[in-house]
């Protein structure tokens, strides 16, 4: 009997690089399928029981208008990520986003970015992991393959033991493809793309961490609470064990408006190669 697992998408943010439009609504397929619909097309065959969108005040209504209360007969729920604009310039990033959905998450879940295409096998790997292990799990990507050519980006860099258990995830910011060696990175390093299988108890621990973070940084308008960093802290404190898996899938992403056509061509080629 399959276990209940939720699929949680972080879709609260809007990017200045993308002209303050919703990246997840980029048309990436000839029939006008959006990026988020294509991601769901890949994910749902794995067997997820519920879809949860973590939205912001600018994305809440558009997502509700697109998906309503169900998608492909799977229940859809929404969690609103809020922040105090008198104290903050923006939300506290991904731990804050995930904890916004605390009351929507009833069981184990996979959480991921809403503007990335991870591939159908990636979701199957994480979903199937639950059938054989109670550990948390995540996927690795080759760093050199997931850095934009012209823009800096952030990535969580993995360290693992001989049994492919994650021992550390170090969040590196402002990574530039042509300057890796300057910050002691290599193109072949294994990195995170913010897709994790986690338990309900892990979410409770992250919620406690977030509350402490908020108290300790009450007046800092920009400091952020990164999901890979706090997962790493739970691992180091032995509250969490996490398996790391390779994925055969190619990951696609949209950063700038011109990426929409690029990704559309990449996905078309990807689909044709599957035939």
State what each model feature region is:
Residues 2-66, 85-86:
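N-terminal glycine-rich phosphate-binding loop and ensuing alpha1 helix
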Residues 14, 115-116, 143:
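Active-site metal-binding loops of divalent metal-dependent hydrolases
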Residues 49-51, 75, 108, 135-137, ...:
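Residues at the starts of beta-strands that form the adenosine-phosphate
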Residues 62-67, 126, 206, 263:
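Hydrophobic packing residues within well-ordered alpha-helices of enzyme cores
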Residues 71-108:
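Short phosphate-binding loop-to-helix
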Residues 107-117:
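Short beta-strand-to-loop acidic/aromatic patch adjacent to the donor-nucleotide binding site
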Residues 119-204:
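Conserved core of the sugar-phosphate nucleotidyltransferase
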Residues 169-172, 177-275:
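Conserved alpha/beta core of the MobA/IspD/sugar-nucleotide pyrophosphorylase nucleotidyltransferase superfamily
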